[in-house]
From Swiss-Prot:
Catalysed reactions, semicolon-separated: Hydrolyzes single-stranded DNA or mismatched double-stranded DNA and polynucleotides, releasing free uracil
Protein name: Uracil-DNA glycosylase
Main localization category: cytoplasm
Record gene name: ung
Organism per entry: Chlamydia muridarum (strain MoPn / Nigg)
Lineage: Bacteria, Pseudomonadati, Chlamydiota, Chlamydiia, Chlamydiales
UniProt KW keywords: Cytoplasm, DNA damage, DNA repair, Hydrolase
A molecular function GO annotation: uracil DNA N-glycosylase activity
EC number of the protein: 3.2.2.27
Similarity remark: Belongs to the uracil-DNA glycosylase (UDG) superfamily. UNG family.
A GO cellular component entry from the record: cytoplasm
Active-site residues (renumbered): 70 (proton acceptor)
Amino acid sequence: MHEAFTIEQLPQSWQEQLKDEWSQPYWSQLLTFLKSEYANATVYPKKEHVFSALRSTPFDQVKVVILGQDPYHGEGQAHGLSFSVPKGQALPPSLRNIFQELQADLGIRNETGCLQTWADQGVLLLNTVLTVRAGEAFSHAGRGWEHFTDAIVTKLIQNRTHIIFVLWGSAARKKCDLLFQTKHQHAILACPHPSPLAAHRGFFGCCHFSKINYLLKKQGKPMINWKIA
């Protein structure tokens, strides 16, 4: 069980940034909790997918950060990337709204909800909490994952420059509070969450996808191809 959550599961660049987390008290408590949960309940995503966001987008390759909250809690949906579902899965409401905004913004129409190609291009699709019990949203909140993902965000803010932080909703903004408290060389795009409850309050019409590519082009970096084949 613990082998699934060792530092060796991460790319070298993330290992160097996060090595101190494995010796923190919260980490051993989190591992004990996860061992019990995976043994006695159905937990998403599968253990081998929990660190998919970090494996897909190494620290030194992060160009954009899109923060989610906790994984989808339906069967077969969560695979370690925020907002993403495996190919063949129906689009959850928030992702459907994300794709609706993408089409309105750039005319790109996506049919499949697997965002792996975005991650491969430098978009870190990170949830605040990395696991969840089946059918119980936020069931693994407050168990330690927040400390771990806080460390990820802090390392990116402090040890990288010119990252585009995409903050959809108040939880993502709060997670990146350090961006609003310190001087830095990052860009911030913020608007309401794409969930059906909030999307009409300013997510639709935010044009974040074209703005991301405008900023990347300005930085001399390759733009993101948002089209999913």
